[in-house]
């Protein structure tokens, strides 16, 4: 049950919470939920209870997509303009609310935007200052904002250009990432910890823990070029966080037949040596896949 209007990032995807910008597109795994919907010709309202079986779980046992929550979406159509409203009440993250819009301005241009305010959110926190201890813990943090604005141009030959800029206040701040870099530098020197090399290597590997977030930096620019002639689809996209100049470049090619789908993709993470994307554990990824539907 995917909600919201963005491509690279979706602030109001409060039920499915689907991973975005994956190398291989796949059918999202459904979430256990109860749903009620009312709709008319130009409007609709949806009420969802997601993960009802987790209603009595503790916060530590129900982080992220596992949290039991009530969610609402309202939809109103006004000509070429689609308007959305969202609300969510999570068992431990409590209230959040959001709005979104998508406007088909011309035959070629579409403009979209989305924003969400959160009272609490799940995120990574550095719990220990001791270099010899693993510091990263998943916990409930305070208020945050998420927002996105984007535009897409589509040509008559099935060429398209998508540009999106988003802010994700649920990921680590620039100050936290500076502390992260300083900790990496300290762990690289034996005298700073007094630990043997294998122990320091394990602690350095643990520093990759917060890199599982969907956005590493809070502000990101995303550009995607695509071309889809009949059964083929070729794309090139770039993710660029202005804070440190890192970059994530992905080139992909897909062929879709009646029963078979073939995919090839190449992803490269890089940038200045101190940028986060240049320090990810995996910086080059090649994917080749064949999928048959039955």
What are these regions (language model features)?
Residues 20, 45-53, 78-91, 97-101, ...:
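Transmembrane beta-strand segments that form the barrel wall of outer-membrane beta-barrel proteins
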Residues 1-52, 271:
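Outer membrane beta-barrel
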Residues 7-11, 57-65, 95-100, 123-131, ...:
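Outer-membrane beta-barrel translocator domains and adjoining extracellular loop/strand segments
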Residues 18-22, 55-60, 86, 130-138, ...:
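Extracellular loop and loop/strand-boundary signature of outer-membrane beta-barrel proteins
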Residues 32, 41-45, 68-70, 79-83, ...:
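Outer-envelope beta-barrel architecture signal
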Residues 77-80, 102-238:
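Detector for outer-membrane/organellar transmembrane beta-barrel domains
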Residues 28-32, 39, 66-70, 93-97, ...:
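Residues that define the transmembrane beta-barrel architecture of outer-membrane proteins
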Residues 223, 260-261, 266-268, 280-294:
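Outer-membrane beta-barrel "beta-signal"
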């Amino acid at each position: 049950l995917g909600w919201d209007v963005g491509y690279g990032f979706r602030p109001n995807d409060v039920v499915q919470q689907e991973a975005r910008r994956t190398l291989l597109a796949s059918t999202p795994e459904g979430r256990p939920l109860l749903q009620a919907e009312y709709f008319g010709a130009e409007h609709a309202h949806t009420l969802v209870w997601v993960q009802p079986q987790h209603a009595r779980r503790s916060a530590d046992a129900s982080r992220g997509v596992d949290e039991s929550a009530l969610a609402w979406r309202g939809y109103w159509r006004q000509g070429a303009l689609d308007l959305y409203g969202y609300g969510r009440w999570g068992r431990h993250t409590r209230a959040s609310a959001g709005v979104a819009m998508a406007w088909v301005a011309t035959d070629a241009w579409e403009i979209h935007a989305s924003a969400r305010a959160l009272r609490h959110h799940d995120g990574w926190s550095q719990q220990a200052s001791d270099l010899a201890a693993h510091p990263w813990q998943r916990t409930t943090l305070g208020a945050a904002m998420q927002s996105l604005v984007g535009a897409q141009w589509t040509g008559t030959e099935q060429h398209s250009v998508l540009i999106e800029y988003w802010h994700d206040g649920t990921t680590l701040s620039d100050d936290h990432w500076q502390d992260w870099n300083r900790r990496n530098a300290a762990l690289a020197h034996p005298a700073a910890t007094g630990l043997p090399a294998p122990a320091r290597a394990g602690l350095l590997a643990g520093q990759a823990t917060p890199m599982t977030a969907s956005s590493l930096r809070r502000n990101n620019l995303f550009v995607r070029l695509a071309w889809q002639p009949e059964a083929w689809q070729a794309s090139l996209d770039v993710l660029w966080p202005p804070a440190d100049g890192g970059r994530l470049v992905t080139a992909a090619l897909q062929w879709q037949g009646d029963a078979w789908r073939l995919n090839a993709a190449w992803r490269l993470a890089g940038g200045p040596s101190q940028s986060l994307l240049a320090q990810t554990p995996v910086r080059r990824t090649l994917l080749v896949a064949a999928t048959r539907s039955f």
